[in-house]
């Protein structure tokens, strides 16, 4: 019973392939190791390298023991031991087997045997660059590689042999020829070295010149960049000046066009537009007159009289005419005439209507005085232009205007004892005479 227990608790230690890490089943020759075999395997190692004293004494102490054979038992646990090169020497060659105390002899023999097997693999690994143990397939692969290496080595050996034979067959003449060639090659080498030194010197000179040229090129690049910036600035200023010049030229051209238009423009016609609207004569769109059917506001009539006074005043100034007996005072819709004989007397050319309009005759006196000024203008024009003639003859003493080219009747410019129709027609004829006078002045003084 105890033997069975001891047998079931025994641990088997196995090895793995150092290339593919597959578990190995060792050959039976590793299980039977005698003293002679151990000495044969360890002899090369002891002659080439110094063995550790402890290991030698341990092997000599255990060399007289009887060989043993490992038997596999059911229920035995197995443990893989890592390769010896990946562990220290002490740990690689030390094994601890756990079992019953009563089976101490068997455990000691197994431990010694495994230690010896591990040492053998260490010896094999130390002799080559390959770690041991190896499985059969890895061993075959290794052998193929070694065969290939052997063939290469043999080929090299053959080549060396042939070279040696050629050298041995060479005579003294060939040796002298080779010596001459060697001297020539040495001279050639010296010449080439000298040329190389000259080239190196030239290279240094060229490098220095290149640095100078690069510095000069950099300076020129900077100057070029500066010139480019200055050119761009000048170009920008030129474009701005060109734009300003074109703008000024356009302004001058526009001003010239406007000047030409102004030269061709009749200032009096542009300023004083005399026309008619039905039975009314108009000046600058202000109606001068009044009808029962069209009761024009007195503000509009006063404004029309103001424009009429301004027109006659401008024509007289253009001709250098000074009126006798009266002086025109253009004052908008409150224009009037001053009597030159009585400075305190003013004749208003404006009216507000009402009852006072029918009893106050100053407005009528002012209109008759204005008609007198128009007659003086006509007479002044006739002095220099005998053919000048107004379309409607004026009778200043009666204060009437005759329709010489039409019905032949005369119409009073006064409002008292007169109808609005006749008064309006008289004012229309007066504006027509002023329009003719304006046209004559424009033709005579257009270029002055």
UniProtKB/Swiss-Prot annotation:
Gene Ontology molecular function terms on file: GTPase binding; identical protein binding; phosphatidylinositol 3-kinase binding; protein kinase binding; protein-macromolecule adaptor activity; ubiquitin protein ligase binding
PTM annotation: Phosphorylation at Thr-117 by DAPK1 reduces its interaction with BCL2 and BCL2L1 and promotes induction of autophagy. In response to autophagic stimuli, phosphorylated at serine residues by AMPK in an ATG14-dependent manner, and this phosphorylation is critical for maximally efficient autophagy. Polyubiquitinated by NEDD4, both with 'Lys-11'- and 'Lys-63'-linkages. 'Lys-11'-linked polyubiquitination leads to degradation and is enhanced when the stabilizing interaction partner VPS34 is depleted. Deubiquitinated by USP10 and USP13, leading to stabilize the PIK3C3/VPS34-containing complexes. Polyubiquitinated at Lys-400 with 'Lys-48'-linkages. 'Lys-48'-linked poyubiquitination of Lys-400 leads to degradation. Deubiquitinated by ATXN3, leading to stabilization.
Coiled-coil boundaries: 140-268
UniProt GO cellular component terms: autophagosome; cytoplasm; cytoplasmic side of mitochondrial outer membrane; cytoplasmic vesicle; cytoskeleton; cytosol; dendrite; endoplasmic reticulum membrane
Crosslinked residue numbers (Glycyl lysine isopeptide (Lys-Gly) (interchain with G-Cter in ubiquitin)): 400, 435
Transmembrane in keyword set: no
The keyword Transport is assigned to this record: no
Matching InterPro entries: Atg6/Beclin, Atg6/Beclin_C_sf, Atg6/beclin_CC, Atg6_BARA, BH3_dom
Segments of this protein annotated with the region Disordered: 47-66
Family membership noted in the UniProt record: Belongs to the beclin family.
More info: Expanded poly-Gln tracts inhibit ATXN3-BECN1 interaction, decrease BECN1 levels and impair starvation-induced autophagy.
PANTHER family (alphabetical): BECLIN 1, BECLIN-1
Role summary: Plays a central role in autophagy. Acts as a core subunit of different PI3K complex forms that mediate formation of phosphatidylinositol 3-phosphate and are believed to play a role in multiple membrane trafficking pathways: PI3KC3-C1 is involved in initiation of autophagosomes and PI3KC3-C2 in maturation of autophagosomes and endocytosis. Involved in regulation of degradative endocytic trafficking and required for the abscission step in cytokinesis, probably in the context of PI3KC3-C2. Essential for the formation of PI3KC3-C2 but not PI3KC3-C1 PI3K complex forms. Beclin-1-C 35 kDa localized to mitochondria can promote apoptosis; it induces the mitochondrial translocation of BAX and the release of proapoptotic factors.
Protein name: Beclin-1
Species lineage: Eukaryota, Metazoa, Chordata, Craniata, Vertebrata
Gene symbol of the encoding locus: Becn1
């Amino acid at each position: 019973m105890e033997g069975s227990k001891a047998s079931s608790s025994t641990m088997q230690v196995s090895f793995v392939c150092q290339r593919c890490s597959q578990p190995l089943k060792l050959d039976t020759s590793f299980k039977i190791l005698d003293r002679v075999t151990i000495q044969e395997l360890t002899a090369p190692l002891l002659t080439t390298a110094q063995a550790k004293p402890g290991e030698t004494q341990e092997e000599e102490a255990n060399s007289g023991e009887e060989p043993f054979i490992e038997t596999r038992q059911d229920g035995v646990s197995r443990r893989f031991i890592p390769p010896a090169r990946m562990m220290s020497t002490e740990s690689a060659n030390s094994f601890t087997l756990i079992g019953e105390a009563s089976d101490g002899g068997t455990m000691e023999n197994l431990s010694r045997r495994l230690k010896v097997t591990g040492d053998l693999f260490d010896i094999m690994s130390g002799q080559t660059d390959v770690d041991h143990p190896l499985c059969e397939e890895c061993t075959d692969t290794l052998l193929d590689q070694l065969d290939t290496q052997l063939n290469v080595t043999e080929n090299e050996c053959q080549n060396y042999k042939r070279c040696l034979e050629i050298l041995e067959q060479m005579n003294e003449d060939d040796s002298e020829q080779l010596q001459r060639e060697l001297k020539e090659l040495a001279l050639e080498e010296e010449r080439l070295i000298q040329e190389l030194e000259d080239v190196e010197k030239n290279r240094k000179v060229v490098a220095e010149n290149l640095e100078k040229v690069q510095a000069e090129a950099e300076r020129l690049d900077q100057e070029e960049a500066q010139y480019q910036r200055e050119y761009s600035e000048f170009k920008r200023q030129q474009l701005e000046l060109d734009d300003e010049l074109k703008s000024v030229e356009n302004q001058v051209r526009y001003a010239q066009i406007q000047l030409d238009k102004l030269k061709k423009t009749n200032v009096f016609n542009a300023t004083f537009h005399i026309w008619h609207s039905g039975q009314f004569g108009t000046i600058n769109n202000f109606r001068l007159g009044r009808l029962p059917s069209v009761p024009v506001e007195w503000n509009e009539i006063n404004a029309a009289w103001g424009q009429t006074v301004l027109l006659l005043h401008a024509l007289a100034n253009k001709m250098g005419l000074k009126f006798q007996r009266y002086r025109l005072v253009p004052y908008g819709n409150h224009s009037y005439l001053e009597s030159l004989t009585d400075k305190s007397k003013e004749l208003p050319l404006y009216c507000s209507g009402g009852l006072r309009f029918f009893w106050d005759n100053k407005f009528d006196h002012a209109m008759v005085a204005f008609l007198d000024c128009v007659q003086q203008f006509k007479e002044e024009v006739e002095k220099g232009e005998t053919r000048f003639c107004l379309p409607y003859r004026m009778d200043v003493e009666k204060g009437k205007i005759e329709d010489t080219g039409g019905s032949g009747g005369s119409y009073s410019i006064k409002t008292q004892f007169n109808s609005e129709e006749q008064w309006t027609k008289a004012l229309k004829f007066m504006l027509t005479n002023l329009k003719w006078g304006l046209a004559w002045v424009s033709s005579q003084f257009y270029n002055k």
